[in-house]
């Protein structure tokens, strides 16, 4: 029990970022899945970290730009790096480009989300009539 308490007490800021990180793929989910997921993460954590490797970098940049251009997010930090990825356990490591984009909520984020929810409700009630 003491080990768990010690681990919790020693949590650093990078550990808390793991909870609000979205690893974006350019093949697994549609673009707006990530846009909507990022909005939910920002509601919950006030910021979201989008990360991608290789070909998915264009997708993560597009997601960030959609959120910024629609007034939901502001850019806090962008980090680029190269990571070694192995396709096979004994294979050679291959360098892959990686990007991490940290986005924070804008001041009017909550108003925009409320307006979006209201528009969705209005659209649902119109379809039912």
Language model region names:
Residues 1-45, 58-129:
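Long, charged, low-complexity intrinsically disordered regions
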Residues 48-52:
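Short glycine-rich phosphate-binding loop at a beta-alpha junction
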Residues 54-56:
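Short, internal active-site loops enriched in acidic
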């Amino acid at each position: 029990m003491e080990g768990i308490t010690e681990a919790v007490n020693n949590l650093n800021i990078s550990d808390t970022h793991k909870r609000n990180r979205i690893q974006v793929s350019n093949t697994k989910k549609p673009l707006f899945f990530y846009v909507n997921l990022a909005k939910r993460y920002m509601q919950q954590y006030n910021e979201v970290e989008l990360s991608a490797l290789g070909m998915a970098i264009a997708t993560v940049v597009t997601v960030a730009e959609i959120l910024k251009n629609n007034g939901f997010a502001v850019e806090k930090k962008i980090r680029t790096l190269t990571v070694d990825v192995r396709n096979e356990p004994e294979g050679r490591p291959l360098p892959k480009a990686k990007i991490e984009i940290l986005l924070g909520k804008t001041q009017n984020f909550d108003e925009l989300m409320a307006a979006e929810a209201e528009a969705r409700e209005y659209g649902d009630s119109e379809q039912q009539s």
